[in-house]
Amino acid sequence: MTNCTDEDLDNYLLNQVDLRHRQVSKCVEDVQKIIKDLTTEVSSKDARFQSIANAGVHNASLKDQPALMSKWSALLRGRCAYNPAIQVLSPTLYLISVPLQGLMGYKERRTRQWRYYTLTGSRLLSPVREPEKLHQWLELESFVNPSQEWHDARMTIEGDIVPAKVVNVFKDLLETSIKTRGLTNKVSVLESVGTAVRVAVETSEAQIEVKLVPTVELMNYWPKRARWPRLFRRWPSTERARCIKSFGFNLMASSNYHWLLSFSRAEQVLLSNIDEDGGCRRKCYRVVRQLKEDGWCPGSKPVITAFHLQTLLFWTCEKYPCTRDWKDFRGCVLRLVQKLHKCVSQHYLRHYFIRSHNLLKYSNTNELDEVAKKINHFLENPGTYIH
């Protein structure tokens, strides 16, 4: 067995991980500028879609909540250079949420049980399938004060705000905006399966595939199905958990009928001060992410993404909450890799906030098995990878 030392890991961080971070940061900067221009143009044509500059606590609906905005700024000051709407899933694959406007005062309510409509509005003999654990219906009546513009047959059917219809309107506006802004040489719309809007963005470093998803941002509200924090858990602290829940969650238009629950703001806050006790959690995450991208799971559409690794880190932090558990850099990296190997081998990784949902449920099992073999080889010979 070829072993590795803390010094080897520190050199790996300096020579490989930091280089990757600089390259990705440059690409994010380029993509952010282009998508901001495009979504600003889209918003000028239809105010229901906002610029990504208004994502998160910059959302226009939060102007009357300065305390929440101040809290967010204080938490992420100096720690988060990226726009909160942008999630880097791999060096060449980004997910960007496009905030929606005009849906105010959300409250969870019991929705009617069955839907019998198609996306074109015609009737079905049997009902549309029910949403899975990480999805839900979204009705106009869930909002105290939806703007009149949302009472629009192009986006709703029988009182439901239908993701596929919202995406279709957005896609038409986006294609027009690419031409209006003269960005046809930098942005091209890709063929998509389902409701996704996928574009290829040319940057100074690489071509980036971007998935654009219209998103309802729900601040100061935590969904009942996300039973978190769990009883008798010591990480994060009660105060931090209360703060995180105040930032709410998102509903993303990522399927035909149902809206996907997303906790991206909560995840950003969890990461922002994850090592305030002087631990090495974030360093471990960065090393494992680099190993994944270099050898275990490379490519533009990896079966394991940065989101999976982030989720794994949160579960590991919860299981090992003490400062002393995160002092041995080498040991902590190997522990995280071992946990990743177990999840990939079993094809099972629980969502951190809705733990009944398996994030690997629909992943390609052959690809997962191949990744598991590579991770196992690393665990047998870590020194051959860390140099």
From Swiss-Prot:
<dbReference type="Pfam" id="PF03281">
    <property type="entry name" value="Mab-21"/>
</dbReference>
<dbReference type="InterPro" id="IPR046903">
    <property type="entry name" value="Mab-21-like_nuc_Trfase"/>
</dbReference>
<dbReference type="InterPro" id="IPR046906">
    <property type="entry name" value="Mab-21_HhH/H2TH-like"/>
</dbReference>
<comment type="similarity">
    <text>Belongs to the mab-21 family.</text>
</comment>
<dbReference type="InterPro" id="IPR024810">
    <property type="entry name" value="MAB21L/cGLR"/>
</dbReference>
<protein>
    <recommendedName>
        <fullName>Protein mab-21-like 3</fullName>
    </recommendedName>
</protein>
<dbReference type="Pfam" id="PF20266">
    <property type="entry name" value="Mab-21_C"/>
</dbReference>
